[in-house]
Amino acid sequence: MRINMVRQLSISRAVSQPELLTRKGVSFLFLLFMVVLTAPNAMSSEFEVQIQSLTAVDRQYMTEQRKTVEGLANRLGRRVSGIAARDLDTLQEIIDRRWVDAEDVQTQQALGIVFGDLLAEELDFDWVIYRDKKGRSRALRYREEDIYVFPITLISRRLSAGAALSVESLFEEQLQKQRPKLPGARWMPN
């Protein structure tokens, strides 16, 4: 028995075997891919500062950080009281005793949170999330004004660099720097 094969009638390739990616298709996908990859960079150069309220996670994290400092203060027979003169002295004692290593960024930041709480109380600032093209930070903000302080960074950068740090001097420096920026500053006592 012999089988005769008959050739298929000629029809266009598009109908008989559609190609998934033609050169035009590959070029289009490459162009689309490049646009998607470069879009965030284009936007980041125009990225404006975004301010948000603290999230529940931020508040919980900051509470835990305060507990870390409270534990260090307890080793001195003290507690974090919210009274600037006492707490600044406590922070200074913790730093002077070198209880926080230069590599222990988390505890350094905990000290910055307590330091920030004292500034916030003195200047009537609130904790917010400050997001810019460099990243996300916890910062202090005066009401709805564009007046910010970054107390966590103020402390942690100095400690991680091993720089001498006078917490009280830094506190006074920030008060002197921020008070003139506040609305009604002309009438505020120094």
State where each predicted segment sits.
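Amphipathic protein-protein interaction modules
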Residues: 109-158
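Boundary at the C-terminal end of the N-terminal hydrophobic targeting segment
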Residues: 42-44
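N-terminal secretory signal peptides that target proteins for export/translocation
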Residues: 1-22
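Solvent-exposed, acidic/flexible segments
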Residues: 104-108
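A recognition module on extended beta-rich or small alphabeta surfaces enriched in W/G with H and D/E
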Residues: 139-190
